[in-house]
Structure formats: C-alpha cells, structure tokens
C-alpha cells in the first residue's frame, strides 16, 4: 500500500507537498504559470549575517529568511522554472510551469558561497551534481542562468 503525499495549500497558486517516506517538502504549482509572471513577492522576515540552508543572499553579509515562510520550500534545480529577483523582491516564472509541477530555482543564482554544499538530485540533463554557490562555478556555466543583481555584481568585480 502506497502512502499518499500530504499537501497543504499555501496560496492561490501553490501547495506544499510532503513526501511520506522522507519527510522532505517541496512547493508545487496548483495552477498553470506563464514565463514572466510574477508568482509571488517576498520580504525579509529576518536578516542574518551568515548563510544557512533557509536563507537567500542579498549582500555579502545579508542573508534573509523569507516571508512568507512557505517560500523556503522552493527547492534547487539545475533546470529551474523560477528566479528570485532579490532587488524587486519578486519570484518570477522563467518558463511555463504546469499545474502540479514542482517550483524550483537555481541556488547559485542568489548564493555566492553556501553554508552547506550538497549533491544535487535534480536529474536534469545539465545537472551540476554538486551545488556550493556561484563562487564555485565557472563563468561559462553561470552565463546560462539568470542571476541576482548581487551575484552579477560579485562576478563583475571578479573579472
């Protein structure tokens, strides 16, 4: 007998799904979303001076805890369907997202050097396998992604 995923509706466009075997949570679209669509705005619930696995980096020493909190369940993918615009504080669809599809973003698009590196399990054709932050990736890979203004500034200073 297969145990069903637990789902929690969190907005007009998304729900959190919890895997019954691992307990991991992810955010999924409950409606179709189009490229360029602002799917949510966000704010800083708290500003931390160090990264942790729940923060989004906006400056060298500013890592924000997201508000609304359920945005923390937007997981990583090397083939993301949304970007975090940390300047406008908006999450924007970058390709069509079908109802039921997991909402994902590319963590190095906002993170310079992550608190915890991890092995990526996204299974995309372009999977990078180990995710550590933009500082650990070659420019030719990063140019394939839409990056936050902060990460782009870091790269500009590096070159």
Regions found by a protein language model. Name each.
Residues 1-159:
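Conserved catalytic SET/PR domain of SAM-dependent protein methyltransferases, capturing the structural core
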